[in-house]
């Protein structure tokens, strides 16, 4: 690459670096985006660079594929209802083992390998996430039926004090989505929804969903149908028309929730795209879908 071209790329990023200096970005790092070593390296480098140019990334991670593999090794079949994992006591122990015991530490190690300072947390750390058991409903024969998801929670309250301290001390917090109820019971939280709640509580400027798709598309197999910018009302219309289904629905609920709580924009990007986070933030066109309130 010619030297002047490199300079042009850096200069294109300058107004965004100025605009977002000292802002908080919540990065939801999906399990499906952790597909290979190269993709994990790209994400880690992007987050460390953000920190060094004065932006404060806060990571909430998932781990669905690894949890599924661990469950299958132990003879359990993963079960989902509307994109939420049905979680009995044994499944919860597997979830905690994979999220807190493995994935969280792996992400912290990657960030530190590339020059960042990172601290692994869960929602249990410093009473970070207070949760309650989630009640899920399904419609059957025009009747609303309550479904028991087991030890699945929803966020009641996020105490940001610990995250604030770490951010001020130049650390990148890395959070596993396990919450605690008022009786001290652990609850499995959907990582997308937890990320939206934490982003709102932190007054984050952006919520960036790093997943395994390029963004929101009319046809998942046709890159030309990718939407670069959508509003909440447009998103709701797409759900009604069946363009958004399954595991994407909790992601969209998290996006809308974050925007309702004051986050300025939400971005969905593909972690398999080299340096997708940097390209989405620091270029005019971006590489994914940006969602705004209106």
UniProtKB/Swiss-Prot annotation:
Record's signal peptide: none
Compartments where found: Cytoplasm
Pfam families linked to this entry: AA_kinase (PF00696)
InterPro entries, A to Z: AceGlu_kinase-like_sf, AcgluKinase_fam, ArgB, Asp/Glu/Uridylate_kinase, Glu/AcGlu_kinase, NAGK-C
Biochemical pathway: Amino-acid biosynthesis; L-arginine biosynthesis; N(2)-acetyl-L-ornithine from L-glutamate: step 2/4
Keywords of the record: Amino-acid biosynthesis, Arginine biosynthesis, ATP-binding, Cytoplasm, Kinase, Nucleotide-binding, Transferase
Catalytic activity: N-acetyl-L-glutamate + ATP = N-acetyl-L-glutamyl 5-phosphate + ADP
Keyword Iron carried by entry: no
Site (Transition state stabilizer): 28, 251
GO function term, MF aspect, one: acetylglutamate kinase activity
SUPFAM superfamilies given in the database record: Carbamate kinase-like
Ranges in coiled-coil conformation: none
CDD domains tied to this protein: AAK_NAGK-C
GO cellular component, one term: cytoplasm
EC number(s) per entry: 2.7.2.8
Residues holding substrate: 63-64, 85, 188
GO BP terms, alphabetized: arginine biosynthetic process via ornithine; L-arginine biosynthetic process
Family: Belongs to the acetylglutamate kinase family. ArgB subfamily.
Biological function: Catalyzes the ATP-dependent phosphorylation of N-acetyl-L-glutamate.
UniProt name for this protein: Acetylglutamate kinase
């Amino acid at each position: 690459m010619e030297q002047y071209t490199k300079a042009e790329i850096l200069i294109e990023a300058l107004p965004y670096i100025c605009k977002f200096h000292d802002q908080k970005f919540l990065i939801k790092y999906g399990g499906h985006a952790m597909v290979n070593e190269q993709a994990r390296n790209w994400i880690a480098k992007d987050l460390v660079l953000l920190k060094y140019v004065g932006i404060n990334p806060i990571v909430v991670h998932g781990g669905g594929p690894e949890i599924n593999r661990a469950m299958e090794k132990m003879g359990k079949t993963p079960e989902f209802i509307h994109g939420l994992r049905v979680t009995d006591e044994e499944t919860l122990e597997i979830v905690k083992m994979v999220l807190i015991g493995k994935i969280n530490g792996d992400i912290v190690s990657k960030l530190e390998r590339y020059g960042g300072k990172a601290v692994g947390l869960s929602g249990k750390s410093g009473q970070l996430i207070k949760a309650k058991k989630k009640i899920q409903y399904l419609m059957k024969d025009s009747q609303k039926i309550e479904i028991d998801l087991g030890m699945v929670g929803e966020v009641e309250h996020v105490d940001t004090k610990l995250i604030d301290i770490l951010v001020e001390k130049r650390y990148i917090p890395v959070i596993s989505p396990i919450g605690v109820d008022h009786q001290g019971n652990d609850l499995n939280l959907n990582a997308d929804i937890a990320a939206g709640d934490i982003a709102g509580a932190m007054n984050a400027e952006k919520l960036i969903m790093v997943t395994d798709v390029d963004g929101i598309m009319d046809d998942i197999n046709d890159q030309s149908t990718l939407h670069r910018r959508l509003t909440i009302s447009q998103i709701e219309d797409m759900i009604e028309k069946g363009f958004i289904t399954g595991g994407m629905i909790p992601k969209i609920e998290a996006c809308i929730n974050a925007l309702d709580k004051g986050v300025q924009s939400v971005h969905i990007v593909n972690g398999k795209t080299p340096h997708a986070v940097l390209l989405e933030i620091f270029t005019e066109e971006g590489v994914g879908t940006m969602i705004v309130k209106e």
